[in-house]
């Protein structure tokens, strides 16, 4: 009986130690920066292309330690404490051409970010044309443009870099780096933290 009692006491002590360690670890770990992207697909993209694009953009943000949650249409999505919400509008050709004309957008621009209202505008017809011309998968290019434009929403003005995902022109070379710089990562994480 005494032997069993000691085993039970020891098991309880080990369990308490493990639970305390787990609670301390959870409390000491900072909450992961999260962006909730509310997507309106006015271009009616193929679901596989949009899913692939979201996966590409998610990988780019994940490499910076940032979690992405994608919400489509009128769905409000999950409530996530500390998350920053942005709007992504994948424009139809007609909508994009109106915006391009109204804003005087250059012919090589694939999207625009309006930081004031937290919206990224994606010119899907231009991305599709570039994908065909460069023989690249549209989902990959769309994902890069999504990450780039959302990056503009979170970074200071004039945030283009010489290379990486925030380069002014999309780099189609297979060896290109498709990531945020360390400075950009820090700035994005700070923007998410200060928005809350």
What are these language model-derived features?
Residues 1-5:
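N-terminal secretory signal peptides that target proteins for export/translocation
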Residues 9-21:
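Bacterial N-terminal signal peptides
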Residues 149-165:
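Catalytic Zn2+-binding segment of zinc metalloproteases
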Residues 159, 165-196:
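Post-HExxH zinc-binding segment in Zn-dependent metallohydrolases
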Residues 30-45, 125-131:
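Acidic/histidine-rich, surface-exposed loop or edge segments in extracytoplasmic proteins
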Residues 47-153:
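Metzincin-family zinc-dependent endopeptidase catalytic domain
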Residues 21-28:
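Boundary at the C-terminal end of the N-terminal hydrophobic targeting segment
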